[in-house]
């Protein structure tokens, strides 16, 4: 018996789909940028201690912690050590020329006279990583050929940013600054810098133009560690000096002047044990050595150090072996931290590509519709090893050919670009971008 045919179901748009005729409705924004505040949460922060500039002060104090500083040095050492370069929008000669101009303006691979130091941008981004947000004012000057070139970027420290001003749609409009001018007695208050004249770095931005410090999750561990160190120092002092005891006559009653004087003597010794003591003839002062051993506080300190490191994306001091010795395999260490480093490098490059590069290109190429981009390449030993092995196989495959150079070149050109660079093959486009700038890009006046 033939099966009864089923009527095909009518296709209807599912959740999240859109009718092609309604595509134009996607243009424009209906939802303004809104503050991420609710109840005790103010701009993503629920702890009053960490709200506003009071929070910035806490993060600044944390920089004196050895574990925090060590982690920051490692993170930004890795970020800076990557191979940074400017990638043109295409292989078109004009796009390559624009990329070469940006490469020269950013001072990549060259911090000589007439070039802006690329490391200054990293210093500004490091402040954003520590405090959540940092910025720099873009200052252009006229070059020898009439082009507007980068004169300098004036760092704007988070301590000097009083407020971010927004437009009616909730988008950032300006930075409101205040602070004392160095080298003079002038105090600037309410200075507004348009957002388009700045390069802004935000760490862990949620879309509301409110960054969050990378140290935020490390604060509880830092506070506990700080309190623990004070207790350890106080306990060690008691073990070294002893507990003071003062024997007084039985006639001295509580609440009398003599009783208060006895309390003051003991108190002064605790605060200043090296000072001398004057006692009445029938009073006796002594110190008692503590016989019990101090508790081992190292595991607690190690725990909080590990918590601080984990909050910053580094896990090197959480892997422990027997006998309390800390160690970690190099390969495992790289796997634990590499993604943290790469994500920060992308965050840095995205801000430069969004807020800085277009502002250097458009004044000189007003009709430009595409821009070069700052990108990076991590040094990976495994890539070179694999490429070298593959190259050996390719050479062996064509070694008996009468026309080795032509075939070898064709094989090399077929390799992925990253593998060719690992082999040391010259990338003609990248070399054209990295050519030293000529005199047209030099300053017509000396940089201040």
Swiss-Prot record:
InterPro entries: P23-45_portal
Residue segments, region Disordered: 1-25
Subcellular location: Virion
GO cellular component entries: viral capsid
Domain of life (superkingdom): Viruses
Sorted UniProt keywords: Capsid protein, Viral capsid assembly, Viral genome packaging, Viral release from host cell, Virion
Primary localization: virion
Role description: Forms the portal vertex of the capsid. This portal plays critical roles in head assembly, genome packaging, neck/tail attachment, and genome ejection. The portal protein multimerizes as a single ring-shaped homododecamer arranged around a central channel. Forms the portal vertex of the capsid. This portal plays critical roles in head assembly, genome packaging, neck/tail attachment, and genome ejection.
Family: Belongs to the P23virus portal protein family.
Complex and partners: Homododecamer. Interacts with the capsid protein. Interacts with the terminase large subunit; this interaction allows the packaging of viral DNA.
Record protein name field: Portal protein
Organism encoding this protein: Thermus phage G20c
């Amino acid at each position: 018996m033939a099966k009864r045919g089923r009527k095909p179901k009518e296709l209807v748009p599912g959740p999240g789909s859109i009718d092609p005729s309604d595509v134009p409705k996607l243009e424009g924004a209906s939802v303004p940028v809104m503050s991420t505040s609710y109840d005790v949460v103010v701009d993503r922060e629920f702890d009053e201690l960490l709200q506003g500039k009071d929070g910035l002060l806490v993060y600044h104090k944390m920089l004196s912690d050895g574990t925090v500083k060590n982690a920051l040095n490692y993170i930004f050492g890795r970020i800076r050590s990557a191979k940074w370069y400017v990638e043109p929008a295409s292989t078109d000669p004009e796009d390559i020329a624009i990329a070469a101009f940006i490469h020269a303006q950013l001072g990549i691979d060259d911090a000589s006279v007439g070039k802006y130091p690329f490391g200054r941008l990293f210093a500004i981004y490091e402040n954003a990583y520590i405090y959540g947000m940092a910025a720099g004012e873009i200052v252009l000057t006229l070059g020898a050929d009439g082009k507007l070139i980068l004169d300098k970027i004036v760092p704007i420290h988070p301590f000097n940013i009083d407020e971010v001003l927004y437009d009616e749609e909730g988008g950032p409009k300006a930075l409101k600054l205040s602070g004392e001018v160095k080298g003079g007695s002038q105090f600037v208050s309410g200075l507004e810098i348009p957002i388009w004249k700045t390069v802004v770095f935000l760490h862990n931005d949620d879309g509301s133009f409110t960054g969050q410090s990378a140290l935020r999750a490390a604060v509880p561990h830092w506070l506990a560690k700080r309190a623990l160190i004070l207790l350890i120092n106080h306990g060690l002092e008691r073990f070294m000096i002893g507990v003071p005891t003062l024997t007084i006559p039985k006639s001295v009653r509580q609440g009398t002047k003599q009783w208060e004087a006895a309390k003051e003597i003991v108190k002064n010794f605790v605060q200043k044990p090296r000072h001398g003591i004057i006692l009445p003839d029938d009073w006796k002062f002594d110190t008692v050595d503590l016989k019990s051993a101090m508790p081992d506080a190292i595991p607690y300190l190690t725990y909080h150090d590990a918590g601080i490191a984990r909050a910053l994306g580094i896990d090197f001091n959480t892997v422990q072996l027997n006998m309390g010795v800390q160690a970690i395999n190099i390969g495992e260490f790289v796997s634990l931290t590499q993604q943290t480093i790469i994500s920060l490098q992308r965050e840095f490059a995205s801000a430069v590509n969004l807020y800085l590069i277009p502002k250097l290109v458009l004044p000189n190429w007003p009709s430009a519709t595409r821009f070069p981009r700052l990108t990076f390449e991590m040094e990976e030993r495994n890539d070179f090893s694999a490429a070298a092995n593959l190259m050996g196989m390719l050479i062996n495959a064509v070694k008996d050919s009468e026309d080795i150079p032509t075939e070898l070149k064709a094989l090399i050109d077929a390799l992925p670009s990253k593998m060719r660079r690992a082999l040391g093959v010259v990338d003609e486009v990248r070399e054209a971008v990295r050519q030293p700038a000529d005199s047209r890009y030099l300053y017509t006046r000396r940089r201040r």
